[in-house]
UniProtKB/Swiss-Prot annotation:
Pfam families: Ribosomal_S9 (PF00380). Belongs to the universal ribosomal protein uS9 family. GO terms for cellular component: cytosolic small ribosomal subunit. One of its GO terms (biological process) is translation. This is Small ribosomal subunit protein uS9. The lineage of its organism: Bacteria, Pseudomonadati, Pseudomonadota, Alphaproteobacteria, Hyphomicrobiales. HAMAP family: Ribosomal_uS9_B (MF_00532_B). It comes from the Bacteria. SUPFAM superfamilies: Ribosomal protein S5 domain 2-like. One of its GO terms (molecular function) is RNA binding. It comes from Bartonella bacilliformis (strain ATCC 35685 / KC583 / Herrer 020/F12,63). PROSITE patterns: RIBOSOMAL_S9.
Length: 161
């Protein structure tokens, strides 16, 4: 390649190749061969695999109805948040398999997976779900136990005498 001898030649070459950094990435619909969108969600130690397809609003978790799997109303509410906020309560069927962690972590993992799968199916919902904080992975995990301590931060009882 020929060497550029002056700054004017260099600027002419760099201006010719126009790089627009302000263009937002275009999100396209991601579907599998059966017309479903798939996403994984994580929370604490729980990992959820979530599939979304057009349907009547039925939610299945580990081959059980989600009302049967999650007995506590708070966990059901957490699970349904992204669908309710996106106003798609009765439009999609959700099938999820979740493993690891407790029920609270599993509900959070499914919520994260549903949010991601919704954005794959309908990219226009991304801004709404992003503002609600549903697409962000909650990175809080249990702090490890340290040696010389009873728990992560709790010390053994101290006696002066």
């Amino acid at each position: 390649m020929a060497e550029l001898n002056s700054l004017s030649e260099l600027s002419a070459v760099t201006n010719a190749v126009e790089v627009n950094k302000n263009i937002a990435p275009v999100h396209v619909q991601k579907l599998d061969s059966q017309g479903r969108s798939y996403a994984t969600g994580k929370r604490k130690d729980a990992v959820a695999r979530v599939w979304i397809k057009p349907g009547t609003g039925k939610i299945t978790v580990n081959n059980k109805e989600f009302e049967q799997y999650f007995a506590r109303p708070v966990l059901r509410m957490i699970l349904r948040q992204p669908i309710v906020i996106a106003k798609r309560d009765t439009q999609y069927d959700v099938v999820a398999t979740v493993a690891g962690g407790g029920l609270s972590g599993q509900a959070g993992a499914i919520r994260h997976g549903i949010s991601k799968a919704l954005t794959y199916y309908e990219p226009a919902l991304r801004t709404i779900l992003k503002k609600g904080g549903f697409l962000t992975r909650d990175s809080r995990v249990v702090e490890r136990k340290k040696y010389g301590k009873a728990k992560a931060r709790r010390s053994f009882q101290f006696s002066k005498r």
